[in-house]
Amino acid sequence: GSMTIEYTLDPEDDVTGHLSNIYRKQYEYRSIIQKCVNTGDVAGKRSYVGGIVGRMDLGYLTACETSSCTITNENGSYTGGIAGLTGATVHGSFSKCTLSGKKYVGGIVGSGVQENVDGSGSTVSWNYSLVDITDCQQYQGAISGSDTGTFEHNYYVSDDLPGINRQGYTGRAEPISYAELLTLPDLPESMKSFTLTFVADDKTVLSRAFNYGDSIDESDIP
């Protein structure tokens, strides 16, 4: 889905040209997503695919979570654990998922924007990710695939992923250990548990719970 403005004319509600010029026309819009949790797989074939919202041109997203899911973008760009593309604010959210896409793939957002239609830019702050990116042609990161927009106090756990497009940034996108992640007082329970699932012919053969950093013995593989 998207958080944006529908520009199609509504003849019943839209202000028409008959309104006198002595009246000042002013519009206000509000759009908030709060405490939304997604545990289901998301698949798209075009640009703007996200665990919570695909394209976010406006509004405010906070305290959301994607957990134990796969987010795939077959042919398009801008794939994110929380938002595919944001031109607004993404704050205080958690992402634990597997992602794939063509360009601009990020654990929190695929990319932000420098300047939106109303002159403002995106802000991505105080988010945490523990993700795996299995396929990306260009521009990937545990937080974002692009450094466009404002990034503040975002943190990620990864042995191989950069924070934002091949780099980590102090104060913007910093790596932390899993032990440090566990010290967060508001850490969702889903960030503390892991399940290994074996699938054959689209059927689950075996599922096993394990701790972060555990190794799997060959005898455990069906």
Regions from the language model: what does each represent?
Residues 199-222:
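Extracellular modular ligand-binding repeats in secreted and cell-surface proteins
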Residues 1-201:
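Predominantly extracellular beta-rich ligand-binding scaffolds that present long acidic/polar faces
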